[in-house]
UniProtKB/Swiss-Prot annotation:
Residue intervals of the UBC core domain: 2-148
Organism: Schizosaccharomyces pombe (strain 972 / ATCC 24843)
The reaction(s) this protein catalyses: S-ubiquitinyl-[E1 ubiquitin-activating enzyme]-L-cysteine + [E2 ubiquitin-conjugating enzyme]-L-cysteine = [E1 ubiquitin-activating enzyme]-L-cysteine + S-ubiquitinyl-[E2 ubiquitin-conjugating enzyme]-L-cysteine
CDD domains in alphabetical order: UBCc_UBE2N
GO biological process: cytoplasm to vacuole targeting by the NVT pathway; postreplication repair; protein K63-linked ubiquitination; UV-damage excision repair
Encoding gene, per UniProt annotation: ubc13
UniProt name for this protein: Ubiquitin-conjugating enzyme E2 13
Amino acid sequence: MALPKRIIKEIETLTRDPPPGIVAAPTEDNLRYFKITMEGPQQSAYEGGKFHLELFLPDEYPMMPPNVRFLTKIYHPNVDKLGRICLSTLKKDWSPALQIRTVLLSIQALMGAPNPDDPLDNDVAKIWKENEPQAIANAREWTKKYAV
């Protein structure tokens, strides 16, 4: 099945003008499956880390959001142990007007501003709420250990 023009155009834009700190490229054998490398945002607990993610565009895209998950372990209240991400634009707030680029920038922004009030990992969120300095130290430690 041929790729929709929308996906082809998004791939061209991501290649020509990648978002800062993000490299996103489809695999050669499946142009709906992207390998992502995302730098941790500056002045965050993830600064200096390189995080690997996978993004898959379902057949219904752009009517349905892409499936995205972290492959690199990350200590974050909005990411579970399987790498799934709690982000409203990937669920209830998805709009066909959004693009892959927007999704990736939203994930990078979530790294810079974790939201322990809407967690996917309750244990991490509890620490983040009760002892934020300790949670940030844990996130930095995991970044140094896993996101190199």
